Every structure is written in C-alpha cells, then in structure tokens.
Amino acid sequence: MIKTLSLLISCFILAIAAGLSQAQEAPPASLAAPEAAAKATPADGHVIHVTAPHLIDGKVRGPFHHYCKIVSPEPFIECLLYETEDNNAKLIGVEYIVAKTVTRDEKVLPRKAWKKVWHDHSVEGVIGNVKVLDMPPDKAKEFADTVAKTDGIIFSLWPEGAKLPTGKVSIGTMVGHAVHQ
C-alpha cells in the first residue's frame, strides 16, 4: 500500500514538473502579439495603402499591397510590400519612392544606375495599375499627385513560391517600365 501511494505521489510530482517545464518553454503570449508599444518605432506610420503589380525577374507579379509612410517632405516615402493584406502576411519587399529632384541629380545617383533600376511614377500613374486604398478620394488624389513627381526602386526579397527567403534580392519595377539605354 505504501509502495502504491509512493508511486502515485511520484507520478503526480512528475506530471506537475512536466507541465511546468512545458509552460516555461512556450513563448509568452506577449511576444506572439505584443501590445502597442508606448515608444514610437520606425515601423510605425506605414498607413498609406496602395496596390500595384510589379515586373520581377521578367514576370508580372501581384498586385502587391504597399503600406507606405512619408519619411520626409521632399518627398521620401518608404513602402513595405506584402502579397496580401492579411495581418500575418510576410514582408516580401520594400519600395523607396524619392523625389525626382534627388534621383535625377547626377551627383547623387549616376544616370546609368537610374536608367537601369529606377522607374518613373508619372508613367505608372498614367498606365492606371496603381490603386490608392483606404482614404477619401481627394486625399488619394493628393497622394497620387505627390507620387507622380517621384521615381521608385523596388527590392523584392522573397522569391515567388519559395518557403523562405533565399538571399537573392531582385530589383522589381513597374509593369510597363522599359530599361532605358
């Protein structure tokens, strides 16, 4: 009887210890879905939502969801690119949108480099592939008019169909962009 009771107590203690061990190994819920940070971060402010297809490695892909923020008034805009608008969508690229007064300055960016990897957003707007979402029409037009005075460069970080990034970064461009000679 004492042996049976000792065995039951031992099993009970082992079960509790195993449960505590598992609980300690599981990531805290606060890491999986952190509360809003009190301190502002560089990731804050990507709230301008735009969709547009891209030409990546010779293939039309998308449309991609761009979540953009205006970093400085020249303008300098950065966009985080996703395949979907799901809140758990993976980041698949980045687009930098920069005023033509900066990108067309030979002292800042050699013309040969601009011609190869940058695209003109005034052309992209005319083609009609870009849609500004989640804002009133007058604000969407104001944003589109601002972007029309810029050039863009797209870094595609996640190859199509890959389960993980491979380390290969492709330079995407707008659909309809021709590499200038």
Where are these regions (language model features)?
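Bacterial N-terminal signal peptides
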Residues: 8-17
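Boundary at the C-terminal end of the N-terminal hydrophobic targeting segment
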Residues: 21-23
